[in-house]
Every structure is written in structure tokens, then in C-alpha cells.
């Protein structure tokens, strides 16, 4: 950790406790700042708040008094708190510096940063890069929006490590000097407009990731969205990825992933399914190569990495049948991606909480569905949907029952896909619980030797 002195004796107001606010406050205190933590909820019984007070940090909960701005503090804001909160609006009017916690991770760390952002795929890309580091002699640690507070992890790495950080648009709005050595933008679509108000605002937040990069840094982005990158403000060396054509970067040709004419791996050897995941894989492989990770380590990762839990997660093979857990697919769009990810016949496990949705928009994506197993409140809707398309449909009481019932009708090379297109709350407390029940049922049906 660098002995950063830029905040020594400075007044700093941390707005929003949570995990990131707690770690930021502890770090700021260690750096010699005069720290106050503020949160809109009552913190009188909060364990983190009590711990901070025991360290001599002032904590104010239950309201956001405007008097907190009287000392003209630097503000470290929880990224989830919108700029429309009166305290933040007043800080903007006063011209106060407003940062997010990831800025602190950059200020104190000598480790080169791989920053990953984008509307879709950033968690998969970040996790896959992390897996490649684990299989390599080069060391890297995950941080950021993926669940590991960046300012805490930054204290644990050295100049010989990489800090692999998932970055949301909310976090990127609050950076000043933050500079990743390798920046990745997976894609940019319309999202979070309730927070950003306009698509331009959202896109500009994402572009913050490369604003401080120099010619010694790298930007990796989707070739087919290159028009969104503002070349006049870009100084980093730019590499592209594409699944459709040869580009200056990494691409797919003759079903191989290719970098600078070198074939790395065939598509059929990848564990992660789907065209969208192929784009994620290209971005991760390119970042790994630029970080000095060996091709062997990259291949080891690509042939074993099963994905993020409950997100089109490969959980194993029984005889010739691969099973995929996509329990996080709680809406039709996510299930469309899942159904489009396979060329093999699919046994599709579907259903859950009835929110009044119409599932007809799934019809164009059902061509590879051989059989459906419907359960939950939406069972009857999925029966009707399947029968309208001439699909074989059976019903089950729940996910576990569905896995049991398909054992007598499954055919060689069928893919078994849990992608409910519905929330889980009619039968399970969370989508994680539903996914874990699916995994246990798969394991229970494995042959014993």
C-alpha cells in the first residue's frame, strides 16, 4: 500500500455506510483524514457504525443534515445514492469534490488495474480474468462491484499484482484520477436511466473508465460499438474484439479464437455457452494476454470455468447430457439469451412466480427446445406456450421433481436447462435457493459407482 498523504488532515464526509462506506471510512482514518460518516437510516444499533465510533470516527445516522457541508469536505459517496438527494445536490452547488470509494483504491495502490465495465457481461468477464490469474504464475485479485470492496483489496496487493475491478456506471461517475492500465468496455446499451436520466449521461459515465489513460495503457472494446468511443479524448492503445470479423485485436475465425493470427482455442472446447459469452471470453482473453498470462493458463481456464453461479452456469454432465443452471433468469429477456445459447436439443425447465407476464416473446427462441418441464404458478401458461409450438410438455411440482421426472425421457446429447423466466418467490425464497435445489437434484441423479 502506498503511503498516500493527499488526504492527511482533510475533512472527508462519507455518505452511505454499507460495506464500501465502512471500508472507505476505516481507510480514510488510517490515511489521517478527519472523517465523518453519514447515512439516512438509523445507525444506533449498526455493528459497523459502532466499530467506526470505537475507532474515533464520528457517525451521524437517521438524516442527511446540510450542516455537514459547512466544513467544505471532500465527499466519498456510496455509488448507489443518487445525485438527487438534497445533501448531494447541495454539495454539487457548492462545487465540492464528490468521489466514490474506487478512487481511493487507485490512490493507495501501486498495483496495475484492470477495470471492467459495460451494460452486460462485466461480472462474467471480471470473474473469468480472475480465474485465469488463479491458473497463472501472475497474481491478480478481484475487487469492486463483484462483491469485494476495492479500497480494502487495494491495501492487500503489491506492485507485482494486478487489481481486477468490476466498475458500475455509478462508481465511474465518482472518479477523478482513477486510471486502469487495462480498461474493458464489454458493451453499452440503455440501462439505469432512472439514475442517469438520459442515455447520453449513462454512456458518458461508462466512458469515464478511459479518461485518464495514457499511451502506455490499453482499452479493450466491442468493435461493433466502436462509434461510442470518443477518439478525440482517447490516448490509450485500443484493441477490439469481434465474433463476426477479423479486427485489430481478438476475433473468431473458422471457429477458433484468434489473436494476431495465432489460434488459441476452438469454440467447441469452451465450457461457457452462448454468443454473448463468446464476446465475454474474447474480452477476458485479450486482457489476460496483455497482462502476461500464459496461453496454457488461459486455455486451462476456458476449458474449466463454468460461469457465475446461477447465470447459465455449467454444473456438470450426466452420461452425455450437460446441465446448466440459469436460475437468475427471472425475466424473459434472460431466458431468450439462454435458449439461444445451444445448438443441441434442449430440455427446458421453466416456471415460477406469476407476475402477469405474456411469454409469447419466447417463441422465436424455442426452435431447439425438444421438451419442456413446467412448474410453479406459471405452469399452465408454459403448458399453453409449449403446446402452441408443438412441443412435448410435462409438469412437475418443483425444480427437484422436474429433474427427477426427466430421467426416464432424456435422450443422448440433450441439454438440460433451468431457465425459469420467472422469479422464484412462489416456491423459493431466492433464485439462489432455487438454483441450489437444481444442483442438488442433478447430483442426486448421478450414477453411483
Curated annotation (Swiss-Prot):
It is found in: Cytoplasm. One of its GO terms (biological process) is cell division. Pathway: Cell wall biogenesis; peptidoglycan biosynthesis. One of its GO terms (molecular function) is UDP-N-acetylmuramoylalanine-D-glutamate ligase activity. Its main location: cytoplasm. Pfam families: Mur_ligase_C, Mur_ligase_M, MurD-like_N. Keywords: ATP-binding, Cell cycle, Cell division, Cell shape, Cell wall biogenesis/degradation, Cytoplasm, Ligase, Nucleotide-binding, Peptidoglycan synthesis. Belongs to the MurCDEF family. This is UDP-N-acetylmuramoylalanine--D-glutamate ligase. It comes from Staphylococcus saprophyticus subsp. saprophyticus (strain ATCC 15305 / DSM 20229 / NCIMB 8711 / NCTC 7292 / S-41).
Amino acid at each position: 500500500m502506498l503511503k498516500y498523504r493527499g488526504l492527511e488532515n482533510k475533512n472527508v464526509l462519507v455518505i452511505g455506510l454499507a460495506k464500501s462506506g465502512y471500508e472507505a471510512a476505516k481507510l480514510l482514518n488510517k490515511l489521517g483524514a478527519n472523517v465523518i460518516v453519514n447515512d439516512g437510516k438509523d445507525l444506533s444499533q449498526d455493528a459497523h457504525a459502532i466499530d467506526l465510533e470505537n475507532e474515533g470516527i464520528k457517525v451521524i445516522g437517521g438524516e442527511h443534515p446540510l450542516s455537514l457541508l459547512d466544513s467544505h469536505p471532500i465527499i466519498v459517496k456510496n455509488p448507489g445514492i443518487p445525485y438527487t438527494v438534497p445533501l448531494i445536490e447541495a454539495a454539487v452547488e457548492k462545487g465540492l469534490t464528490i468521489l466514490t470509494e474506487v478512487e481511493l483504491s487507485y490512490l493507495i495502490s501501486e498495483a496495475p488495474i484492470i477495470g471492467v465495465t459495460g451494460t452486460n457481461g462485466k461480472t462474467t468477464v471480471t470473474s473469468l480474468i480472475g480465474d485465469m490469474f488463479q491458473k497463472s504464475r501472475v497474481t491478480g485479485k478481484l475487487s469492486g462491484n463483484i462483491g469485494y470492496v476495492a479500497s480494502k483489496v487495494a491495501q492487500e496487493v503489491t506492485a507485482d499484482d494486478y487489481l481486477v475491478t468490476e466498475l458500475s456506471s455509478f462508481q465511474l461517475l465518482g472518479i477523478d484520477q482513477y486510471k486502469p492500465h487495462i480498461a474493458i468496455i464489454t458493451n453499452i446499451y440503455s440501462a439505469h436511466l432512472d439514475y442517469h436520466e438520459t442515455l447520453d449521461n449513462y454512456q458518458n459515465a461508462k466512458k469515464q473508465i478511459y479518461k485518464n489513460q495514457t499511451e502506455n495503457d490499453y482499452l479493450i472494446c466491442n468493435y461493433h460499438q466502436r462509434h461510442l468511443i470518443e477518439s478525440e479524448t482517447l490516448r490509450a492503445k485500443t484493441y477490439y474484439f469481434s465474433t463476426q470479423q477479423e479486427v485489430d485485436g481478438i476475433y473468431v475465425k473458422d471457429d477458433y479464437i484468434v489473436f494476431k493470427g495465432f489460434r488459441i482455442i476452438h469454440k467447441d472446447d469452451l465450457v461457457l455457452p452462448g454468443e454473448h459469452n463468446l464476446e465475454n471470453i474474447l474480452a477476458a482473453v485479450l486482457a489476460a494476454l496483455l497482462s502476461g498470462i500464459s496461453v496454457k493458463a488461459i486455455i486451462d481456464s476456458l476449458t474449466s470455468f463454468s460461469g457465475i453461479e446461477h447465470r447459465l452456469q455449467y454444473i456438470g454432465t450426466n452420461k452425455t447430457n450437460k446441465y446448466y443452471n440459469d436460475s437468475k433468469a427471472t425475466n424473459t429477456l434472460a431466458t431468450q439469451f439462454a435458449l439461444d445459447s445451444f445448438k443441441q436439443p434442449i430440455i427446458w425447465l421453466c416456471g415460477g412466480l406469476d407476475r402477469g407476464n405474456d411469454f409469447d416473446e419466447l417463441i422465436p427462441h424455442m426452435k431447439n427446445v425438444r421438451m419442456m418441464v413446467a412448474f410453479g404458478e406459471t405452469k399452465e401458461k408454459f403448458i399453453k406456450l409449449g403446446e402452441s409450438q408443438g412441443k412435448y410438455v410435462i409438469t412437475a411440482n418443483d425444480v427437484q421433481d422436474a429433474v427427477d421426472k426427466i430421467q426416464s425421457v432424456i435422450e443422448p446429447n440433450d441439454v438440460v436447462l433451468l431457465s425459469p423466466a420467472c422469479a422464484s418467490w412462489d416456491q423459493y425464497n431466492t433464485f439462489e435457493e432455487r438454483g441450489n435445489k437444481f444442483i442438488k437434484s442433478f447430483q442426486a441423479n448421478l450414477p453411483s459407482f
